[in-house]
Amino acid sequence: MMNIHNELTNENIDSYVIWGRGRKEKNNYEYKMSNKLSVYIHGLYTRFTDKTGFLSYIDTKKIIKKLNKINPDIIHLHNIHGYYINIKMLFKYIKDNNIKVVWTFHDCWPFTGHCAYFDMVNCNKWMKECYNCPQINTYPKSIVDNSKWNYNMKKEIFNYDNLTIVTPCKWLSELVKKSFFKNNDVEVIYNGIDKNIFKYTNNKYFKTNKKIILGVASEWTERKGLKDFIKLDKILNHNKYQIVLVGIDEKTKKNIPNSIITISRTNNVNELVNIYSSAFVFFNPTYEDNFPTTNLEAMACNTPVITYNTGGSPESIENNGFVIEKGNYEEVINILEKINIKVKYNNVFTKENMIKNYIELYKKINKKGEKI
């Protein structure tokens, strides 16, 4: 989001960024709309009602007031779930003012009655109408089931012709075309990374002659495949290979065998680059995903990738790794013994290409190209 904003500013196109959670604003073109208390209250409301996206009245009024001052030609939405915005109020403002909208889907939440992903429970109710949700206890967690109400409210609220949907992979675009968004324009713009940052380095991170099997996640939930790393570790030749997991918190660490090296989440990008560059292979056993940039980061550091055939994860691999079926962690053993890949990174997946594609889309949608 900020990468696109910065490039628009460099091209002398008026651009403003509004977000709900995270750091504070740095200038007059940035606006943080929520605080910890309002997010907590919205989250608590969701827990007891299963109506995420239908609170945050005050915060959303502030956004609308800000938007009225900006008078945008295009509004580019990203994740509008996360306990910080009222989707009904937002889209009423958009429709009343007939504002062009680009909306990047980062998961499946916009067209389901509750969940962000549904692969692990193999649920396709979202194609017709959600009800009796099997994932009420997953984000956004609730103790009641209002999935049918949510589904129909979203279907009504998001019904807008002046909306272009962007997905970061072909997999998600195909799902969108089967949802109640099927009549909207859908574009695929792949996520990209900064190749000036993520590149191979000789600074080896690990002092071992063993070959490193690396896993990286910001949060090691069940859908990220942590259990499969533990299963793989049990059948691994420990004289030859070493599993290393990055992003492990203290609570999760207690359930991981000592034979696996764990590293807490790092905000030092240079350290992460050294870790990627030191790995023999990057293993991504994800069970639910959109288009994981960890694959891109690993390949940019010349590390081949093994991933499950999940979501858009295989779309970036090309000849730089292997795609195996979900749960087939045993196949990793066979691949380790025969892998001989010289990674050639595809520049389709660069930050520069991603930004260029978004700006071209803006200009196509809005020929004036004044305020975005």
Could you tell me what each predicted segment is?
Residues 166, 205-224, 230-233:
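Conserved donor-binding/catalytic core segment of Leloir-type glycosyltransferases
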Residues 177-178, 183, 192-209, 254, ...:
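Acidic anion/phosphate-binding donor-loop and adjacent secondary structure
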Residues 250-270:
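Nucleotide-activated donor-binding/catalytic signature segment of Leloir-type glycosyltransferases, i.e.
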Residues 274-279, 358:
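Short alpha-helical donor nucleotide-sugar binding micro-motif in glycosyltransferases
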Residues 287:
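Aromatic "clamp/platform" in nucleotide-sugar-dependent glycosyltransferases that forms part
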Residues 304-307:
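Short hydrophobic beta-strand element within catalytic cores of glycosyltransferases
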Residues 322-329, 336-339:
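Conserved acidic donor-binding segment of nucleotide-sugar-dependent glycosyltransferases
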Residues 340-372:
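A charged, aromatic-enriched C-terminal amphipathic alpha-helix characteristic of glycosyltransferases
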